[in-house]
Amino acid sequence: MMSVPETPSHAAPQATFETLTAERIAELVAIERLAYSHPWTARNFADSLQAGYNCQLLVAGATLLGYFVAMQGVDEVHLLNITVAPQAQ
């Protein structure tokens, strides 16, 4: 019979999704500048929030790992931005 390995006490925090708030836009802009030669601006993210787009952050504890911005269509979803922080790639 095989046993399930125990999770080490030093295991990384579980990654979860959180909804983007305006207060966290500066964090995304910093990652955009590291990840892309033509990054989104703070205004792009603010406009996406105002338009009601689905803006989600992937976090592990206090660490921002990545994010996406998606626009719901009739029977589809348009992925407008998806980014993994360079340090998490």
Q: Which role does the model predict for each range below?
A:
Residues 2-89:
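Acetyl-CoA-dependent GNAT
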